[in-house]
């Protein structure tokens, strides 16, 4: 049976009425209240579904299989920058465990040699090493980029992990930051990331644009300091924000050619750069952080609504999601909390430096 046309009218008391199946139904609410209730219900539904999606992505939904980026087992290579400690070291190990050959990029040749021996003996894969100080422009860095470009042209490079990064030695006001420190941060976090990606990406595009070819993957490690402006780390925070915009633009450029480009957002992780030595639920060691990153390719988790970004580790994802939930209010609250935290860190760092200086006298 087909229902009569639904007709919304105005009842004598100013309440809306609906004609359905030949009967008039009077709603005991005013039209403005009905509109507000409908809008409120829509927002409630939206956020309920969003939270449910976050829960599913953190618990049961799988990301894209990392092995899908391999052409043939044992022949595909992954490039990992900043690979001799922390997150980069763990990326090299876990990708090798998945039978990717590894191109190791780092500053210290001795550390690269030791890591190369470890990976080849433990995981039965091949390695190559490129030694470079990424923070220093010049012929040595240019030579390293040329070397990486040639390796990408001659090997089946399917993954690039832009991990290497630099931050301030301690929180500091922007107008008091040494120029040398500022340059080191910009050259490492932005300039090198752009240049190394430019060197390797053409070969990845050529590899993946063919019909039936495996996709390629570029992962750049970002920071929630770029997501939430971080006073007293302004230079570092700005470089990480730049990487987010660059990633989104680049991802759309190369998506039709079969290359996936993602920015992975991270909060604190136990590492030399963070200067944190003890793990906690909100500060993981590199191993679980990298595992969550490789297991969630394509899933935004805490970065919902931000294309080509993801926040993979569960506690970082919840933090990112909460900050975005209330928009301006939560972001401003986050900025104030971060400023207070950085003031405290700076105060303690200056006291320690003073004690060390006194001991050295």
From Swiss-Prot:
UniProt-annotated binding residues for NADP(+): 79, 133, 163, 198, 236, 240, 269, 271
Alphabetical list of SUPFAM superfamilies matching this protein: NAD(P)-binding Rossmann-fold domains (SSF51735)
PROSITE patterns per record: ADH_SHORT
InterPro entries assigned: 3_ketoreductase_fungal, NAD(P)-bd_dom_sf, Sc_DH/Rdtase_CS, SDR_fam
The keyword Lipid biosynthesis appears for this protein: yes
GO cellular component: endoplasmic reticulum; endoplasmic reticulum membrane
UniProt record similarity statement: Belongs to the short-chain dehydrogenases/reductases (SDR) family.
Protein name: Very-long-chain 3-oxoacyl-CoA reductase
Organism from which the protein derives: Cryptococcus neoformans var. neoformans serotype D (strain JEC21 / ATCC MYA-565) (Filobasidiella neoformans)
């Amino acid at each position: 049976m087909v229902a009569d046309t639904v007709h919304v009218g105005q009842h004598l008391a100013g309440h809306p009425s609906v004609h359905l199946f030949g009967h008039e139904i009077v709603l005991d609410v005013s039209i403005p209240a009905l509109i507000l209730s409908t809008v409120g219900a829509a927002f409630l539904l939206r956020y309920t579904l969003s939270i449910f999606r976050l829960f599913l992505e953190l618990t049961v939904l799988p990301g894209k299989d990392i092995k899908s980026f391999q052409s043939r087992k044992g022949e595909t290579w992954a490039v990992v920058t900043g690979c001799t400690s922390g997150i980069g070291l763990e990326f090299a190990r876990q990708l090798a465990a998945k039978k990717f050959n590894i191109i190791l990029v780092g500053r210290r040749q001795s550390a690269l040699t030791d890591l190369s021996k470890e990976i080849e003996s433990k995981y039965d894969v091949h390695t190559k090493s490129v030694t470079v100080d990424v923070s220093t422009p010049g012929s040595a860095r240019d030579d390293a980029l040329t070397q990486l470009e040639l390796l990408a042209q001659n090997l089946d490079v399917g993954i690039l992990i832009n991990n290497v990064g630099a931050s301030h030695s301690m929180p500091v006001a922007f107008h008091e930051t040494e120029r040398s420190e500022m340059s080191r941060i910009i050259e490492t976090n932005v300039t090198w990331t752009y240049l190394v990606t430019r060197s390797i990406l053409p070969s990845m595009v050529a590899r993946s644009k063919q019909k039936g070819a495996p996709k390629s993957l570029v992962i750049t490690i970002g920071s929630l300091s770029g997501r939430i402006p971080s006073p007293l780390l302004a230079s570092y925070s700005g470089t990480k924000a730049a990487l987010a915009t660059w990633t989104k633009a680049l991802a759309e450029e190369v998506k039709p050619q079969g290359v996936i480009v993602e920015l992975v957002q991270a909060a604190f992780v136990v590492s030399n750069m963070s200067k944190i030595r003890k793990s906690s639920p909100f500060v993981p060691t590199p191993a679980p952080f990298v595992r969550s990153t490789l297991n969630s390719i394509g899933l935004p988790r805490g970065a919902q609504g931000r294309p080509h970004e993801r926040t993979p580790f569960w506690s970082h994802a919840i933090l990112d999601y909460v900050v975005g939930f209330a928009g301006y209010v939560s972001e401003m609250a986050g900025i104030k909390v971060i400023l207070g935290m950085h003031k405290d860190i700076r105060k303690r760092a200056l006291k320690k430096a003073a004690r060390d200086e006194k001991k050295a006298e």
